[in-house]
Each structure stands twice: as structure tokens, then as C-alpha cells.
Amino acid sequence: PSHPNVYEPGKRPFHTIIPAFIMQNELPLMSFGLMGGSMQPQGHVQILINMFDYGMNPQEAGDAARMNHIGGRRPTGGGDDDLLGVLHVEPGVSQETVKQLEDMGHRVEVVADGIMFGGYQAIYRDQETGVYIGATEMRKDGLAIGY
């Protein structure tokens, strides 16, 4: 009953909905999703940062190394021995970045198995040409196909 995600009257449980839809200049730009529990909102943000801050296309944004924070006090638990949780990173995250995160007090673990980093799919519409571009997850089975 002391878990932050326990069902109680008037309380909304921590839950994320997979699909996301982005509009730009009042036109549809991209529908996408990244399944994977608590990785969903983290993955959504990482995809958007990769595209809009780093200029990656939808496939590059999905293929880029990801991070996944698990544990800690919010939103899904951990006791006093786990106040910060663990930041899992893929091998593609530079050692310099890992060291900087550790120097800031984060507990970082490099994880080679990509399954914990979610599963991503996207359909992107080029605003200038109207051409649709598909992207799919390289960490899991998936296929982007069109005609």
C-alpha cells in the first residue's frame, strides 16, 4: 500500500500511452510510438531531441543510443537504498558522457542488450514534398514498408 503507484480513490496510476502525434504549422508531421513501460516517455523525448535538436531523420533518431532511468523514488518505487535509481545506457553513449553523468552523482550502467530500451516505429511526412518516411526499431523485429 505504500507504493507510489497503488490504486486509491482520486489518484491516477502512473501509465503511459504509446502513440504520439506531432503537428507542425497546423499540418501533420509524424505519428510515432515507443513501447516499453517506463521507457515510453523517456524514449519519446529522446527521439524528439534527436530529430529536432540534432537534425536526425526518423530512422537515425531511432537507431541512436538510448538511456533508460529505472528505480528511484518516483514514479515507480524503490526504498531509501535506491533514492536515485540507475541510469542504463547503451554502448553507443560515449565514455566521456558516462563519466560526466557519474561525476554528477548518477549511478550509470552500460547495458549491451537493447531490449530494455523500447521498441520504436514512426511515420513521418515531409512538409515540403508530402512524401511519407517510415522508421522502425533496429533493436527488435520490425519493418517499415510502403508503396
Per-segment meaning from a language model:
Residues 95-147:
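In a subset of proteins, long, contiguous C-terminal domains/tails are tracked
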Residues 1-114:
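Proteins synthesized as precursors that undergo proteolytic processing into mature forms
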